[in-house]
């Protein structure tokens, strides 16, 4: 199709409602490869019908990094560029051409705008740079939840503002698996400020006010916790927890 061989890869479970929209968005790739981890709603059949290569496999015990690494392993070794997305995400059209314009020999990763949420009137809400486009070899996923890509060697990256990935989640989707995985993630890497922040936020969602406050105060005290947006969020969550405890000002 183009200068480089591009493969999209993903994991999924019970996401039939997103399957057709996602496949339409990912169709600019040469290959679409999916690891289905136990769907009961026909998701694999829809994806296969629309041209995806689907493998079904249970991942036990569940960890997102294990599932992502297994899905990445399904990508043929002769692909040049791997694009990891979730089924509740869509690229704006033209992403493949934008990627090929920016990619060149020696590049190992692409960063691109990720529209995580939208305002009530449909405008971009929270936007940050995502980094889940990478060369086929020399990469792996790490972390039981909120997993991140890690490279085996120093990486040359390119920034591609013309690629726009949008997040359109199911608001009814259960968060039940996240808390134990976040607790595991922090136990494995106690100094990972990002996961400490996420754990404190999760305690807020569960109404565990004291755990929320203690965890986020620890986050704010960590020397590595320098991202202003995340620090501000921790402060807001602490204030909310105190308010829920009846101790707000």
Regions found by a protein language model. Give the residues of each.
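The conserved acidic donor/metal-binding loop of glycosyltransferases
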Residues: 80-91
């Amino acid at each position: 199709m183009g200068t480089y061989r591009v493969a999209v890869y993903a994991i999924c479970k019970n996401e039939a409602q997103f399957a057709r929209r996602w496949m339409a968005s990912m169709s600019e790739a040469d290959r679409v490869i999916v690891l289905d981890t136990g769907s009961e709603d026909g998701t694999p059949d829809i994806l296969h019908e629309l041209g995806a290569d689907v493998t079904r496999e249970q991942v036990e015990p569940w960890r997102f990094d294990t599932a992502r690494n297994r899905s990445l392993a399904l990508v043929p070794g002769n692909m040049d560029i791997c694009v990891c997305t979730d089924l509740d995400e869509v690229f704006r059209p033209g992403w493949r051409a934008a990627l090929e314009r920016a990619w060149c020999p020696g590049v190992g990763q692409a960063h691109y705008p990720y529209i995580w949420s939208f305002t009530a009137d449909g405008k971009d809400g929270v936007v940050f740079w995502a980094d889940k486009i990478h060369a086929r070899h020399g990469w792996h996923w790490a972390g039981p939840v909120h997993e991140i890509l890690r490279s085996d060697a120093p990486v040359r990256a390119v920034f591609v503002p013309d690629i726009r990935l949008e997040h359109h989640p199911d608001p009814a989707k259960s968060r039940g698996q996240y808390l134990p995985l976040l607790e595991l993630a922090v136990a494995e890497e106690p100094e990972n400020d990002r996961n400490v922040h996420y754990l404190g936020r999760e305690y807020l969602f569960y109404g565990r006010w004291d755990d929320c406050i203690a965890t986020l105060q620890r986050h704010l005290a960590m020397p590595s916790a320098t991202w202003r947006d995340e620090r501000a969020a921790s402060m807001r969550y602490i204030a909310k927890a105190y308010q829920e405890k009846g101790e707000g000002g």
